[in-house]
């Protein structure tokens, strides 16, 4: 071959890189877009927008094999491929298998090498100068190629081989130095680091909504919270949480749901109102008025559809209703005065009984009916003459049927009104002036107060009976007295009251129904007028036996005369009634005068054992003074101060024994011989006078049995029990005028002895306070 066919090509610019060198790391995107791509040009860097595109050419076109080296026509084949080229092939295969995103890598998206044109070295521009900048290692390798002689026929193949070798060398250099250059071209992309991260893991999508606001301090804390914490922060704050531009379908659905919820709430209210709780125990009945209905308030305040109502704007109304209910559940506490509290306690009705009795009937009228029945039974007990003297005074047939008259169906009320013997408990004071009586044939029948016929012949006989223990044989002995004897005693002589002591005079005054007077002369005049009104005018007799025995004997004689009157002669009964009318008319003025100040009365106002006391009260009903004497349950220990009921029973027994003794003396004394003054008195005066302090104690206890105290005017015994201060002057005056007369004591006491008696028994006493101006 000649030398002309093999020309030598010398590089005109040995210090710069060859035009077929690899592309530099920095590249201007605008200039690269204008320059057409050629096989001899370096590989261009893709723009950020092109990285997101799907690879089309590299995946569907055949790539050039770098291992197949072309052979020259005259020269031998080139050696095996370098290590950098093998590494390049492995990397390309790995990238093709693991690509999942469009920007998976740049080396796998290489376009195929195109054949270089012959006139490529002739083109030179400013952009080529920028791309010509390479590292020193590349320039040194390019310098070895300069000055090489090649044949003209193999020029194109040699140039293509150089281009492939240069590209592989640039790729290996790029792999060995992954750090970006200091010029700042690859700092924004960081392609190698992004490739490694996407091969290792796939990031999850963040569904939490972050509030992009730099002014809020809690933005970072809100992003770290979970979904439940975010929902917990939604609450109604009087602002519309949803926009008004909602669809018509959503509004219609919400309105239908609200109407359904309202219907359910109204049905629940009706159901709760219809339920009525039945009380079966005493505790439930008493505490029912203080229980609060919590179920009704819970159904109205709790609403499960709160969010839906807040969207429609209905929550403020429900909140206002809730506040009003909370106020109703807390009622105002009203503190009553002591008087109102006691009044409400007295008006409160409590029914005690077992559960079986209360469950028998649960009607609302049961309590009212029960109270009406109790009230009616109490009225019947008060109106019926329950004194057992009524049966014993009528004879043997009446005394044998003591309980038969009052026998009724057994119940708790009938059992409670009887004593240990089975008979009804006797009343304390019963005015039998106009009380009816019963025939012997009605003894075994049960009668009421309305069906009792009047039988006047037994009127005086009932008044003269003294006590239960008085034998009936005494009455039969009086019945045997002749009738002329009663006519002899029709004109009785008036006793000489001037010879009586003050105690006896005060006792006789109380027998006629008046209180004792302080003036002795006025008491004598009062007794004389009462005697004349009752028995008519008579002469004075100085016989003391007649003075003492006169009233008692006349009482017995009149009683015997009354008992002998048959039922078919009502004429004497009318006369006896007419005889008692003037006495009442004469004593009416004194009665009104004595009753003007009931609290200052020193003595009892009635005596059921005296005929004169009962004669002055003809028109008083018996139901006013009929009280049940219920015996208290005694304790095992002996009481230091006996109860009023014990004192009353003891005093009643002593009075009956005294009256029995006095009647026996007057009946047996038929001679007009002179007798001592104490013969007609009770047996207490015959004994030796006891200590005056014991007499004071007996007088105080006797007052409570004869005259029960009231709240405004209590007795002396009640005052002592309540530790009220006792005024010594008033107490001494009462003892001298009335108190000692109740126990048949003629002596008088002074202020010093009364004070000594009070101090010895621990009674609070004091003198009257003098008002000094």
UniProtKB/Swiss-Prot annotation:
GO cellular component: Slx1-Slx4 complex
Domain of life per record: Eukaryota
InterPro entries linked to this entry: Slx4_ascomycetes, Structure-sp_endonuc_su_Slx4
Entry keyword Cell division: no
Subcellular location: Nucleus
UniProt keywords, alphabetically: DNA damage, DNA recombination, DNA repair, Nucleus, Phosphoprotein
Any GO molecular function: 5'-flap endonuclease activity
UniProt record, GO biological process: DNA recombination; DNA repair; DNA replication
Ranges of compositional bias, category Polar residues: 1-14, 165-175, 436-449, 542-558, 611-623
Post-translational modification: Phosphorylated in response to DNA damage.
Basic residues biased stretches: 317-328
Extent of Basic and acidic residues compositional bias: 61-72, 84-99, 476-491, 572-581
Pfam families in UniProt: Slx4
Region (Disordered): 1-191, 248-331, 436-495, 542-623, 653-691
Comp. bias regions, Low complexity: 36-50, 660-673
Function: Regulatory subunit of the slx1-slx4 structure-specific endonuclease that resolves DNA secondary structures generated during DNA repair and recombination. Has endonuclease activity towards branched DNA substrates, introducing single-strand cuts in duplex DNA close to junctions with ss-DNA.
Entry similarity comment: Belongs to the SLX4 family.
Quaternary context: Forms a heterodimer with slx1.
Full protein name: Structure-specific endonuclease subunit slx4
């Amino acid at each position: 071959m000649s030398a002309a066919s093999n020309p030598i090509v010398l590089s005109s610019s040995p210090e710069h890189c060859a035009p077929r060198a690899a592309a530099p790391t920095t590249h201007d995107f605008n200039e690269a877009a204008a320059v057409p791509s050629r096989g001899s040009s370096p590989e261009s860097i893709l723009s950020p927008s092109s990285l997101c595109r799907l690879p089309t050419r590299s995946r569907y076109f055949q790539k050039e094999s770098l291992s197949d080296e072309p052979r020259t026509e005259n020269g031998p084949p080139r050696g095996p491929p370098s290590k950098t080229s093998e590494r390049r092939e492995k990397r390309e295969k790995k990238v093709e298998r693991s690509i999942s995103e469009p920007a998976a890598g740049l080396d796998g998206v290489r376009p195929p090498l195109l054949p270089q044109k012959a006139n490529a070295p002739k083109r030179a521009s400013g952009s080529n100068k920028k791309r010509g900048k390479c590292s020193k290692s590349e320039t040194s390798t390019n310098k070895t190629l300069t000055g090489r002689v090649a044949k003209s026929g193999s020029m194109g193949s040699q140039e293509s081989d150089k281009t492939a070798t240069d590209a592989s060398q640039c790729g290996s250099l790029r792999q060995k130095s992954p750090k970006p250059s200091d010029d700042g071209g690859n700092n924004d992309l960081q392609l190698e680091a992004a490739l490694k991260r996407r091969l290792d893991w796939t990031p999850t999508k963040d569904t939490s909504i972050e509030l992009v606001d730099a002014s809020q301090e809690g933005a970072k804390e809100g992003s770290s919270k979970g979904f439940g914490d975010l929902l917990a922060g939604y609450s109604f704050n009087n602002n519309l949480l949803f926009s008004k531009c909602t669809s018509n379908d959503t509004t219609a659905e919400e309105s239908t749901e609200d109407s359904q919820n309202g219907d359910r709430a109204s049905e629940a209210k009706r159901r709760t109102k219809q339920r009525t709780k039945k009380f079966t125990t005493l505790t439930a009945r008493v505490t029912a008025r203080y229980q609060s209905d919590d179920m009704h308030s819970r159904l109205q305040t709790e609403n499960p559809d709160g969010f839906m109502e807040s969207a429609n704007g209905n929550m403020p109304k429900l909140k206002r209703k809730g506040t009003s209910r909370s106020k109703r559940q807390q009622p105002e506490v009203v503190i009553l005065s002591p008087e109102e509290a006691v009044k409400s306690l007295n008006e409160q009705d409590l029914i005690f009984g077992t559960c079986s009795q209360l469950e028998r009937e649960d009607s609302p009228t049961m309590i009212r009916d029960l109270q009406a029945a109790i009230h009616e039974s109490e009225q019947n007990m008060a109106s019926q003459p329950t004194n057992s003297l009524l049966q014993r005074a009528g004879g043997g047939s009446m005394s044998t049927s003591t309980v038969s008259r009052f026998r009724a169906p057994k119940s708790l009320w009938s059992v409670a009104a009887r004593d240990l013997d089975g008979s009804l408990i006797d009343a304390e004071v019963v005015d039998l002036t106009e009380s009816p009586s019963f025939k012997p044939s009605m003894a075994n029948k049960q009668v009421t107060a309305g069906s009792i016929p009047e039988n006047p012949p037994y009127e005086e006989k009932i008044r003269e009976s003294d006590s239960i223990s008085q034998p009936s044989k005494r009455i039969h002995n009086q019945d045997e007295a002749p009738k002329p004897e009663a006519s002899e005693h029709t004109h009785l002589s008036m006793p000489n009251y001037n010879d009586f002591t003050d105690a006896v005079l005060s006792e006789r005054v109380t027998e006629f129904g008046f209180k004792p007077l302080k003036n002795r002369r006025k008491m004598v005049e009062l007794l004389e007028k009462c005697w004349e009104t009752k028995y008519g005018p008579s002469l004075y007799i100085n016989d003391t036996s007649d003075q003492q025995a006169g009233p008692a004997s006349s009482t017995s004689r009149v009683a015997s005369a009354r008992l002998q009157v048959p039922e078919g002669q009502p004429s004497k009964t009318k006369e006896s009634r007419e005889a008692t009318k003037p006495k009442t008319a004469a004593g009416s003025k004194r009665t009104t005068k004595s009753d003007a100040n009931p609290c200052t009365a020193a003595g009892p106002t009635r005596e059921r054992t005296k005929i004169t006391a009962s004669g002055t009260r003809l028109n008083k009903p018996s139901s006013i003074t009929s009280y049940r004497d219920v015996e208290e349950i005694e304790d095992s220990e002996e009481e230091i101060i006996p109860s009023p009921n014990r004192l009353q029973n003891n005093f009643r027994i002593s009075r009956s024994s005294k009256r029995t003794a006095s009647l026996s003396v007057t009946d047996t004394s038929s001679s007009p011989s002179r007798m001592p003054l104490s013969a007609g008195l009770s047996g207490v005066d015959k004994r030796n006078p006891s200590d005056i302090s014991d007499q004071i104690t007996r007088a105080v206890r006797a007052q409570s049995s004869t005259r029960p105290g009231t709240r405004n005017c209590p007795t002396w015994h009640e005052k002592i029990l309540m530790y009220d201060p006792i005024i010594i002057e008033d107490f001494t005056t009462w003892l001298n005028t009335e108190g000692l007369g109740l126990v048949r004591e003629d002596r008088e006491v002074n202020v010093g002895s009364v004070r000594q008696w009070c101090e010895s028994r621990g009674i609070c006493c004091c003198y009257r306070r003098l008002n000094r101006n």
